[in-house]
Amino acid sequence: MKRGLAVRLAGLALLAATIAGCTGVRVPKAWEPLLEEVRAFEQRIGFRKTATFVEFSEEQGRIPFCGHVSRLYLPYSYEDPAILWYDVATERECRAHADGADVYFGTVEVLGESGAAVSPEVLAVQLQRFLYLVIHEDCHEQFEFPYGIEEALCNLIAYKAMAAFSEEKYGAQAREYIAIQRYTSRESERTRAIRTLYEQLAGHYARYERKEISDDALLKERARVFGRAERALAWKRGSLNNVGIANEMTYSRHYPLLESVYDALGRDLARTVAFFRRVDAIKPSQGEVMKEHDIASKDSLDFIRSYEADIARTIETALAGATRR
């Protein structure tokens, strides 16, 4: 399995877990008209047509993923090269060669790439999950940002689009709208909580790297932070580990910046999509980033960090220009 696909699968599973805990309604049996309505809405906000979810497949099935990372290392994001992704079918296989590392195993109902089909697994989810999958995956086909930017951007667009679409289609009093609105409104709070959690962990890992605390002391501090987070966010006890938090942070790190763009542009989805198309066109190339920062490999963590940071600065500069007009 390609590394990029593996990490996208893990990211999709992460969002599935949060949606699964929400009260909602099922996807209607007549799902094709709903999908057509979503696609029409997408085009109104500036999306181009995509090759995702254009066919139905009985054979696709759920897709497994498996990631490992040392408990003594806090990854930057799901792209961090320290996370090892494996092509295995079961959790038992995933854990068999973990050798004490954190293990992140799960399955998702769809491949996170262009050409994914609608399957029985996709149609068996709650309405929130269906709308999320369609809009988020279609969003990825609109831009060519690094995942650390694009995952957060496509979450932002998906959440705002889900709320707007459901209000148009169902009305503000409908249970579908209320369930979707409740879910999307919780996301900014959850994002802030994830960022705070990660910063707390990063402080402990920085002390460990400076040799101020031992392995055991680090892991005890980590357990305390994870325990508080699981209680605050109503997650299953023991569900968090370093691969999981790296996945979470991929979606959370730049979300506040991107949401500030949406707010500055009048909370207008079409303007927001158009703005990020312009940023996509003027962003620094990978080669320019490598040259500026004297980085030898685009697979390195230095490159991942630098590329995201340079694009974040491009966004801030472009927004300043756009709001002066």
Regions found by a protein language model. Give the residues of each.
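Acidic/histidine-rich, surface-exposed loop or edge segments in extracytoplasmic proteins
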Residues: 25, 135, 142, 238-240
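Bacterial N-terminal signal peptides that target proteins for export
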Residues: 1-10
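N-terminal mature-domain "stem" immediately C-terminal to a signal peptide or N-terminal signal-anchor/transmembrane
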Residues: 23-83, 267, 299-322
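Residue-level marker of regulatory loop/turn positions in helix-turn-helix DNA-binding domains and
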Residues: 7, 127, 250
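Pan-zinc metallopeptidase signature
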Residues: 196-325
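Bacterial N-terminal signal peptides
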Residues: 10-18
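Polybasic, low-complexity, intrinsically disordered segments
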Residues: 19-20, 160
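Acidic/His-rich structured neighborhood in mature extracellular/periplasmic domains
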Residues: 49-190, 194, 199
